[in-house]
UniProtKB/Swiss-Prot annotation:
The cysteine framework is XXII (C-C-C-C-C-C-C-C). Residues 1-5 form a propeptide. The keyword Disulfide bond applies. This is Conotoxin Cal22c. Keywords: Disulfide bond, Ion channel impairing toxin, Neurotoxin, Secreted, Toxin. It comes from Californiconus californicus.
Length: 55
């Protein structure tokens, strides 16, 4: 299977990471998920799809 998504606790929940993985798994190129929190101080988790070798 694909490697588990990176995330920065406590900002990114496992649910968010799983949802991102699901979203990205259908992407033909960027099928890996990377999650990070907003460095500006927002508690929001920002997840996006990346090429697997960019992780």
């Amino acid at each position: 299977g694909r490697p588990s998504a990176r995330y920065d606790a406590p900002y990114c929940s496992q649910e968010e990471v799983r949802e991102c993985d699901d979203d990205c798994s259908g992407n033909p190129v960027r099928d890996a998920c990377q999650c990070a929190y907003d460095p500006a101080g927002s508690p929001a988790c920002d997840c996006f799809c990346v090429e697997p070798w960019r992780r």
